[in-house]
Curated annotation (Swiss-Prot):
Microtubule inner protein (MIP) part of the dynein-decorated doublet microtubules (DMTs) in cilia axoneme, which is required for motile cilia beating. One of its GO terms (cellular component) is axoneme. The gene is Cfap68. This is Cilia- and flagella-associated protein 68. Residues 98-109 are annotated as: Mn 1. It is found in: Cytoplasm, Cytoskeleton, Cilium axoneme; Cytoplasm, Cytoskeleton, Flagellum axoneme; Nucleus; Cell projection, Cilium. Belongs to the CFAP68 family. The lineage of its organism: Eukaryota, Metazoa, Chordata, Craniata, Vertebrata. InterPro entries: CFAP68, CFAP68/107. Transmembrane segments: none annotated.
């Protein structure tokens, strides 16, 4: 009788622990990420996808690229920075130019071409910077009907007498 009572008591405790575990997500292991105060709860395989940093619908998008670590390349090559013209030279600019800059720096001509915004597929895509031969051009019916004829048959084996067969 005492054995069955202790078995019932142990299964009852296991059930209580499971209920507490399922009701409280922080009952599982707590993993402290770093010194910035993020706390990651890792109590099942899917819980990590509901936490900050694992999905794009959190407040991550409200930060600028300068704030987010690792996006310096995207910030550097963004169209807003490329289009921004350099300031006009000052009348006192020659006083602040060093001899090294005067002798060794190459003056790059300022481009008068400004980029016009084109439709893009994803946020990092910048079709304005693609070379012309990579850009897609729409084919009209005239271009498809009156293009160069493509060969319809190919010869698999062509005999060339200049090639010696040994």
């Amino acid at each position: 009788m005492a054995v069955s009572c202790s078995l019932n008591h142990s299964t009852y405790l296991q059930r209580q622990n499971l209920v507490c575990y399922l009701r409280n997500p922080h009952y599982g292991s707590l993993i402290y990420a770093d010194g910035h105060g993020e706390v990651w709860t890792d109590w099942n395989d899917m819980s990590k996808f509901l936490q900050y940093g694992w999905r794009c619908t959190t407040n991550e998008n409200s930060y600028s690229n300068r704030t987010l670590v690792g996006n310096w390349n995207q910030e550097r090559y963004d169209l807003k920075n490329i289009v921004k013209p350099k300031p006009l030279p000052s009348q006192f600019g020659h006083a602040f130019e060093t001899t090294y800059d005067a002798n060794y720096s190459r003056k790059k001509p300022q481009s008068t071409h400004r980029f016009k915004r084109e439709p893009h597929w994803f946020p990092g895509h910048q079709p304005e910077l693609d070379p012309p031969h990579y850009k897609c051009t729409a084919k009209s019916t005239y271009m498809t009907n009156y293009s160069e004829p493509q060969p319809t048959h190919y010869s698999c084996c062509v005999y060339d007498p200049s090639v010696s067969q040994s």
